[in-house]
Structure formats: structure tokens, C-alpha cells
Amino acid sequence: MKVAISGGGTGGHVYPALALIRELKKVHPEAEFLYIGTEKGLEAGIVKREGIPFEAIEITGFKRSLSLENIKTVMRFLSGAKKSKQILRDFKPDVVIGTGGYVCGPVVYAAAKLKIPTLIHEQNSVAGLTNKFLSRYTDKVAICFEEVSDSFASEKIVFTGNPRASEVVGVDSEGALEAYGLVSGKPTVLVFGGSRGARGVNEAVEAILPEWNNRDFQLLYVTGDVHYEKIKDSLAELNLGYHISVQPFIYDMPKILNAVTLVVSRAGATTLAELTALGVPSILIPSPYVTANHQENNARALEKNNAAIVITEAELKNTNLMATVDSILNDETKLNGMKLSAKQMGRPDAAAKLVEAVLSIMK
């Protein structure tokens, strides 16, 4: 069995692809994989580190507004599709899977033209431009949010969830909090703004740290590498208690997510898949800097189901974040209700469901 996968640009497209590869290997240990991405995307480094064969094509994304740059993008798309056809002819995959990001456009399109079975995976509640385009040519469209189903032909849709969800369930959290100077078994809030951190989130947290010093519950505050030194210097005079741990980055996030009580974070699709799979309540601060405001749409889906509270970045200045945290952690009924709601939205079997969808289209 040979599988070609393409997706990239951000971790939200790459990590689901890797989760799918790992799940496919469980079912078909003999399977061969080829990842097609760009050298400039996040995928180049991550995929190569995983030891998965990698081929690169050159492609850029379309602008949503009228732009001369889009003419160049069309030319790159056609060139990328031509190169993708050659790569696919050489590899001879049984199936080709796209997990989003503009790089998978020419790859999945080329596969469809070569009559190779194809599937695309849409992680967000708002369909990406590439997946909208590809859905006309693919055999199946796997989705994670019911809200996005109107963007695709109903006969092609299969609801699988995000395969990253399966990778956090059942992870041993022993010693996870202690590794960051905190105590196991105590109510703990994790705050993070994505892999690089988020200035808006950081500013809101810094503003309430003096108040947090007087709380019993713990805080694991992840600033992001690029913000860490500046924030550490600004906090030096606060004499923060031992129940507050400030870190630049968390490398063992699945372990930490299994150990915390509440999460304050952005609303990327992968993060939400992990939180709901584990039943972790959240305060979501969607990034306003993403395509079609998809993070807010993702977050509202959780809020609608009582699994999260949403605060937009514009609202942060006039919102007491500490009071919002208090309102959840000091109300056991509310906390448990949010846990249950998050769990009910979760798809811990998402990886297996996606594998099932992939196998169903193979000739």
C-alpha cells in the first residue's frame, strides 16, 4: 500500500497529516508514504524529522482580493501540478490525501486528473480556499465541524473529526506539572497563544498576574519563545508565587493537557480537537489575523455547546480575564458542565474514522 499526503504552511495542516500517517501504519505496517510540500513551509522541517520521504514543489497561495500576484500564482499552480503528476507517476500511490494549505492544491488536483483516489481533510469550521476548489475533484471530503458541511457536496462528506485528537487521549500525565515546578493534583490553568505565542494574550495575562498571586489555583503560562525574555524581565519585580510557572514553550503538550483543569488559548482547529477529546474546558481568544476569521468560527462552535467561553481580542481590553477564570474554577457545577460538554464534542476516535474513510475510496 502506497500513500501520498500533502498539506502545509502551518502546523494545523501538518500535524493532522502526521497523525493520519501514524494511524495508517498501525493498520498497514507495510505501507509506504510520501509527503509532498514546499521547502518554505513548516512541513519541510517537521516531516523530514519524522523520517518520512519528502518531495517539494513550488507554489504560493491565492489572494482573496483581486491582485496581479494571482496571475503568477496560477502559473505556479500549473507548474506545481505538472511536477506533482511526475512525482505521483514515479511513486504510484494507491491514494492521495490533502490536509489543507495551498500546497495540496496542485498535488490533489494532479492526482484526480491521474484517476488516483483522493480525499481532502478540512480541519476548520470555515472551508479554506484550496479545499473548496479541490472538493470538485476529490472522492471524499472529511470534516471536523458540522458548520462547514454547506461548503461541500453532501454526498462526498464524511464526518471524522481531527486525527490529532486521538494522539492526546490516554497519555500518561504523571510528573507533567512537576516538570514545570508545579504540584500534581491541584487545579491548574494553562495559558498559551500557539507555538509562537500571541502578544494580545500575553498582555492580558500580564495585567492580571498580581491578582493571580492571591489565588490558590496554579498557572502554567506559556509565553512563546519570541516573547519570553522580554516578559521574564518585566515580571522580575512581581515576586510571583511558586504556584505560577512562566515558560517559553511546552514540548510535551499532550502530557500537560491531560494534567490541567482549564485552558486559555487561541482557537486553532488542532488545539480545539485536543481539548474536546480530553473534555478540557477553555477560555478561547481567537486570533483575528487568520483567513476568513476561521478561529472565531471554530471557537463559537464550542461556545454554542457550552464547552468554552469566547473573548475576542478586541474585547480583551474591556474584559476582566481573572474574573472569567474565577467564574469557572470557583463554580464546580459550571466547571463540570463545561467538561462534559467539551467531552461530548470530542472525537477521540478521529484518526481511526479518517483511516476508515481513506480505505473506503481505495480501488
Curated annotation (Swiss-Prot):
<comment type="function">
    <text>Cell wall formation. Catalyzes the transfer of a GlcNAc subunit on undecaprenyl-pyrophosphoryl-MurNAc-pentapeptide (lipid intermediate I) to form undecaprenyl-pyrophosphoryl-MurNAc-(pentapeptide)GlcNAc (lipid intermediate II).</text>
</comment>
<feature type="binding site">
    <location>
        <begin position="10"/>
        <end position="12"/>
    </location>
    <ligand>
        <name>UDP-N-acetyl-alpha-D-glucosamine</name>
    </ligand>
</feature>
<dbReference type="GO" id="GO:0030259">
    <property type="term" value="P:lipid glycosylation"/>
</dbReference>
<keyword id="KW-1003">Cell membrane</keyword>
<feature type="binding site">
    <location>
        <position position="250"/>
    </location>
    <ligand>
        <name>UDP-N-acetyl-alpha-D-glucosamine</name>
    </ligand>
</feature>
<dbReference type="GO" id="GO:0051991">
    <property type="term" value="F:UDP-N-acetyl-D-glucosamine:N-acetylmuramoyl-L-alanyl-D-glutamyl-meso-2,6-diaminopimelyl-D-alanyl-D-alanine-diphosphoundecaprenol 4-beta-N-acetylglucosaminlytransferase activity"/>
</dbReference>
<feature type="binding site">
    <location>
        <position position="195"/>
    </location>
    <ligand>
        <name>UDP-N-acetyl-alpha-D-glucosamine</name>
    </ligand>
</feature>
<keyword id="KW-0961">Cell wall biogenesis/degradation</keyword>
<dbReference type="GO" id="GO:0050511">
    <property type="term" value="F:undecaprenyldiphospho-muramoylpentapeptide beta-N-acetylglucosaminyltransferase activity"/>
</dbReference>
<dbReference type="GO" id="GO:0009252">
    <property type="term" value="P:peptidoglycan biosynthetic process"/>
</dbReference>
<dbReference type="Pfam" id="PF04101">
    <property type="entry name" value="Glyco_tran_28_C"/>
</dbReference>
<keyword id="KW-0472">Membrane</keyword>
<protein>
    <recommendedName>
        <fullName>UDP-N-acetylglucosamine--N-acetylmuramyl-(pentapeptide) pyrophosphoryl-undecaprenol N-acetylglucosamine transferase</fullName>
        <ecNumber>2.4.1.227</ecNumber>
    </recommendedName>
</protein>
<dbReference type="Pfam" id="PF03033">
    <property type="entry name" value="Glyco_transf_28"/>
</dbReference>
<feature type="binding site">
    <location>
        <position position="124"/>
    </location>
    <ligand>
        <name>UDP-N-acetyl-alpha-D-glucosamine</name>
    </ligand>
</feature>
<comment type="pathway">
    <text>Cell wall biogenesis; peptidoglycan biosynthesis.</text>
</comment>
<keyword id="KW-0573">Peptidoglycan synthesis</keyword>
<keyword id="KW-0132">Cell division</keyword>
<keyword id="KW-0131">Cell cycle</keyword>
<keyword id="KW-0328">Glycosyltransferase</keyword>
<feature type="binding site">
    <location>
        <position position="295"/>
    </location>
    <ligand>
        <name>UDP-N-acetyl-alpha-D-glucosamine</name>
    </ligand>
</feature>
<dbReference type="InterPro" id="IPR004276">
    <property type="entry name" value="GlycoTrans_28_N"/>
</dbReference>
<keyword id="KW-0133">Cell shape</keyword>
<comment type="similarity">
    <text>Belongs to the glycosyltransferase 28 family. MurG subfamily.</text>
</comment>
<dbReference type="InterPro" id="IPR006009">
    <property type="entry name" value="GlcNAc_MurG"/>
</dbReference>
<dbReference type="GO" id="GO:0005975">
    <property type="term" value="P:carbohydrate metabolic process"/>
</dbReference>
<dbReference type="GO" id="GO:0005886">
    <property type="term" value="C:plasma membrane"/>
</dbReference>
<dbReference type="GO" id="GO:0071555">
    <property type="term" value="P:cell wall organization"/>
</dbReference>
<dbReference type="GO" id="GO:0008360">
    <property type="term" value="P:regulation of cell shape"/>
</dbReference>
<dbReference type="GO" id="GO:0051301">
    <property type="term" value="P:cell division"/>
</dbReference>
<keyword id="KW-0808">Transferase</keyword>
<dbReference type="InterPro" id="IPR007235">
    <property type="entry name" value="Glyco_trans_28_C"/>
</dbReference>
